[in-house]
Amino acid sequence: KTMAAKKLVEALDRPDFYFNLGATQDPRGTLIGNTHFKKEEGTTFAESLFVKAIQTKDAVILLDEISRAHPEAWNILMTVLDAGQRYLRLDEHVDAPTIKVAEGVTFVATANIGNEYTATRAMDRALVDRFIIVEMDTLNKDQESGLLKDLHPGITQEQADNVAEIASMTRKEIKSDAPRITNAISTRISVEIAGLLEDGFNLAEAAEVCIYPFFDEDGGVDSERTYMKQVVQKYCGTAEEDIFNADEVEAQEELDS
């Protein structure tokens, strides 16, 4: 989502500003500004980059991970995003001036909406209604493989296909009647794996960093992690085969037989 949004911003060829709302711990400081006290000058107000952004004519402002933002950030954005209001009150400033959003300013936001996403909040419907919603489905195998080759041209087509196939298998598995895993490999993780492959790591090594930590190892040979090792094993070369411990090897042999 973020990558697509950034490509959109680049294509528009207009002044652009990026704000990761999911990462900020200080919504007021990020969107309005902060007051500072100096003995010589007294209390001063430093407006935020966001204030500059909304005053920039024809700017495109990307609000990334808005579904992870603090509710206070949503409250601040309500009037800014409302087509009938389009203003921001700097209530941290001693004079509390009102800043109007400049002509032609466009806001683009990204969000993960749904119970399967952790660390997100149920978004206020009034905030959601201020946007035109574009739903993005998961890439299919061919699309994901093509994306990996585009972003990391140093990997082989076979490597790109293998990573895309592993990701696709996890997405199908969690939708099955009796899924053996509780989450799937995202496109973001696929891209990270491809980056490691391009840097010279093999698939087994990349999986240790990018895949297995996201899958529970409780349950021994019946664990999610063992299942994922079995999936990855199918796409590892002979030099990468030793990815199981002794118990997992026995389980793998039983599965193969």
Say what each PLM segment does:
Residues 1-161, 165, 255-257:
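AAA+ P-loop NTPase catalytic core and its hallmark functional loops
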Residues 140-257:
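Alpha-helical lid/collar subdomain of P-loop NTPases
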